[in-house]
C-alpha cells in the first residue's frame, strides 16, 4: 500500500498537466491515509514501542520500551483528577514519594457531558502533567459502572431510563446500576471509550499512558442478579456454548467453586443456567459475571483496535456475608469468578485485585490463577486506619507473588505526607527494579511480611533456607517485611525493615552454613556500590543493621539494602 501511494505521489509530480481538482483529491486521499496509518501505529512519535504483557518462562510481566517494568504505583482519591487546578500541587508531591506510575480516573460524566460532545481538557492536561513530572499513567475509565453502581454515567444516561434501563432487585425495586445486557448502554459507553482512546493516541507522544482500566469494581450490589424481565428471560435460556466449551476444556484449571457447580450438576453440555450450574446464588453470579465480561470485552477489543494498550478490570473482592453475592458487587471479576471472566473476556489482559482485606496475602494469592498476573491497583484502607502498611505490602507483593504492580489508594490524602515510609520503600524498590524483574522470571526471589498468614515462615533460594523473624523491640506500628534476591550461587540481596533473617544450608552433603560478609549499599547504573561493611555488633542479616532501639517513628523508613555472602560446609 505504501509503495502504491509513493508511486501516486511521484505520478502527481510528473503529471503536472492533470486537472488541479483531481490532483488535490489525490493529495487529500494520501494525507488521510497517512493519518489513519499513524493513529494505529506502534510509533508513538519518539520511536517508543507500546507497552505489552509478555510471558517468559510461564510468568507474565509488563514490558515498557522493551524492558520489564514494575508499577511502583499510587492511585488518586476518586475526585482529585476531576479538576486541573486541584491537581497542580499534587503532581510534584506524588513524584517526591518516588512513585513511578499514577492510577488516574477519567469520568464519562465529565468526558461526554452532552451526548456527542466530548471534553478533552482533563485527559490532555493530565497526560501533559504526568510527563512533565516524569510519571507514567494508568487511565481508569469510570464509565458505565464504578463500585457496583452507575454514578459516573452522564446525566443524559441517568435520566433516560427507557433508553438506558437499570437493573432490578428481586423485589423489583430499581437499582442505581445500568443494565449489562442492554445494547443501548453498551453502545453509548463504547462510543465514549473509543473517543478516549483516539484522544490518547493524538496527545500521548511520549508513551506516558501504560495501561487502561475499564470501569471500576463492576457488579450489582444488593442482589445476586438482575431480576428485570429482560435479564430473567436470558437467565432462563441455555448457557452459551462458548462458556460450556471453555469450562469443559479447562476442568483441571478451574477454581473449586466453578468446578463443583459444573461437575456436581452432571457436566452438562447444554441447558439453562440453573440446569448446568444448579439453583443457587453462585449460579446467579456466574450469569452476571458472564454478561459483565462480554460487555467489557467489547470495550477492550474496540479500544485495542485503536490503541493497543494492555487492559485490565479490577475487583471488589468477594468476602463477608457468608459468601452471598450482592454483599459485594455480584458478577465482578472477584476470585470466585475469575474463570468466567477469563472465558468471557479474552481481550482483558489482567483481572486485578483491589485488596483491602485483613488477610491480604490470601486475597492476593487467590488472584494468581491460570497465569493471571498479580496487579493490585488499590490497597491500604485509610478509612480503616490502615495508614502505614503500603511499604510492607509492596515488598511482599513483588517478592512473594511476583506482582506486576502495587498501588495504595488515596496517595493525595494527607496521611501520605513527605516523610511517609512509602517514600523510602519506593526509592529502594526502584533501585532494585531490574534485579526484581529478572529474579521473578528466574524464580530467585521471595518476599515476606509480618502478621500475614500467607507470608512464608521459611523459604529456599538456591542451596540455602531463609527464616524471617520479627521479634525486635519496636513501635507496634512497625510491621517487619522484606525480600531476598539470589544473585549468584552464594550471594544474595536482602532489603526491608524491622526484621532479621536466619539461614541454614539446604545441602545435605554440606549441612552447615556461615555468613561470610555483609555490605550495605545500593545499585548505580546496574553495579553494586558499597556504602559500608557491616560487622561486629551489627553483623547478621538485620534490617536495619543496627536495630538497638526502633521504638521511635524515625525507624519507620529505615530501609536498608544489604548484599550478603554465605558459605556452606
Tell where the protein language model's regions lie, with residue ranges.
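C-terminal beta-sandwich/jelly-roll accessory domains of carbohydrate-active enzymes
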Residues: 471-472, 492-569
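Catalytic-core region of carbohydrate-active enzymes that cleave or remodel glycosidic bonds
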Residues: 296-309, 335-438
Amino acid at each position: 500500500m505504501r509503495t502504491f501511494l509513493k508511486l501516486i505521489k511521484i505520478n502527481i509530480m510528473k503529471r503536472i498537466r492533470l486537472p488541479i481538482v483531481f490532483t488535490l483529491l489525490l493529495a487529500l486521499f494520501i494525507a488521510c491515509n497517512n493519518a489513519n496509518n499513524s493513529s494505529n501505529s506502534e510509533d508513538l512519535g519518539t520511536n517508543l514501542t507500546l507497552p505489552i504483557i509478555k510471558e517468559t518462562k510461564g510468568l507474565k510481566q509488563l514490558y515498557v520500551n522493551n524492558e520489564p517494568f514494575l508499577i511502583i504505583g499510587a492511585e488518586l482519591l476518586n475526585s482529585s483528577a476531576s479538576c486541573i487546578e486541584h491537581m497542580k500541587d499534587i503532581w510534584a508531591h506524588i513524584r517526591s514519594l518516588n512513585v513511578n506510575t499514577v492510577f488516574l480516573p477519567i469520568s464519562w460524566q465529565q468526558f461526554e457531558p452532552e451526548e456527542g460532545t466530548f471534553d478533552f481538557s482533563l485527559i490532555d492536561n493530565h497526560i501533559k502533567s504526568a510527563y512533565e513530572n516524569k510519571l507514567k499513567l494508568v487511565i481508569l475509565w469510570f464509565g458505565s459502572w464504578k463500585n457496583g453502581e452507575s454514578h459516573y454515567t452522564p446525566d443524559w444516561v441517568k435520566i433516560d431510563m427507557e433508553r438506558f434501563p437499570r437493573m432490578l432487585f428481586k423485589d423489583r425495586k430499581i437499582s442505581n446500576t445500568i443494565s449489562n445486557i442492554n445494547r443501548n448502554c453498551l453502545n453509548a459507553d463504547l462510543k465514549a471509550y473509543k473517543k478516549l482512546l483516539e484522544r490518547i493516541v493524538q496527545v500521548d507522544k511520549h508513551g506516558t499512558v501504560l495501561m487502561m482500566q475499564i470501569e471500576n469494581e463492576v457488579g450489582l450490589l444488593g442482589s445476586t442478579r438482575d431480576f428485570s424481565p429482560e435479564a430473567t428471560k436470558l437467565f432462563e435460556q441455555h448457557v452459551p456454548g462458548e462458556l460450556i466449551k471453555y469450562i469443559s476444556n479447562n476442568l483441571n484449571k478451574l477454581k473449586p467453586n466453578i468446578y463443583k457447580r459444573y461437575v456436581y450438576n452432571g457436566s452438562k453440555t447444554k441447558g439453562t443456567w440453573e440446569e448446568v450450574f444448579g439453583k443457587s446464588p453462585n449460579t446467579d453470579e456466574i450469569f452476571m459475571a458472564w454478561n459483565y465480561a462480554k460487555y467489557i470485552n467489547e470495550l477492550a477489543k474496540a479500544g485495542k483496535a485503536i490503541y493497543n494498550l494492555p487492559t485490565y478490570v479490577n475487583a471488589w473482592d468477594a468476602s463477608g456475608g457468608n459468601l452471598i453475592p450482592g454483599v459485594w458487587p455480584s458478577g465482578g471479576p472477584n476470585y470466585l469468578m475469575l474463570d468466567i471472566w477469563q472465558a468471557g473476556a479474552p481481550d482483558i489482559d489482567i483481572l486485578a485485585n483491589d485488596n483491602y482485606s485483613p488477610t491480604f496475602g490470601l486475597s492476593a494469592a487467590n488472584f494468581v490463577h491460570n497465569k493471571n498476573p498479580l496487579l493490585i491497583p488499590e490497597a491500604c484502607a485509610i478509612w480503616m486506619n490502615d495508614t502505614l502498611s503500603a511499604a510492607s505490602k509492596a515488598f511482599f507483593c513483588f517478592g512473594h507473588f511476583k506482582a506486576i504492580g502495587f498501588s495504595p489508594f488515596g496517595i493525595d490524602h494527607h496521611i501520605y505526607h513527605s516523610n511517609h515510609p512509602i517514600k523510602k520503600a519506593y526509592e529502594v524498590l526502584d533501585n532494585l527494579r531490574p534485579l526484581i524483574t529478572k529474579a521473578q522470571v528466574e524464580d530467585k526471589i521471595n518476599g515476606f511480611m509480618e502478621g500475614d498468614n500467607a507470608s512464608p515462615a521459611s523459604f529456599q533460594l538456591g542451596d540455602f533456607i531463609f527464616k524471617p523473624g520479627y521479634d525486635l523491640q519496636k513501635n507496634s506500628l512497625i510491621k517487619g517485611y522484606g525480600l531476598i534476591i539470589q544473585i549468584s550461587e552464594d550471594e544474595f540481596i536482602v532489603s526491608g525493615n524491622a526484621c532479621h533473617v536466619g539461614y541454614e544450608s539446604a545441602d545435605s552433603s554440606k549441612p552447615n552454613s556461615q555468613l561470610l560478609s555483609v555490605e550495605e549499599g545500593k545499585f548505580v547504573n546496574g553495579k553494586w556500590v558499597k556504602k559500608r561493611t557491616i560487622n561486629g555488633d551489627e553483623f547478621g542479616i538485620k534490617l536495619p543493621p543496627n536495630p538497638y532501639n526502633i521504638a521511635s517513628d524515625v525507624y519507620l523508613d529505615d530501609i536498608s539494602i544489604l548484599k550478603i555472602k554465605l558459605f556452606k560446609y
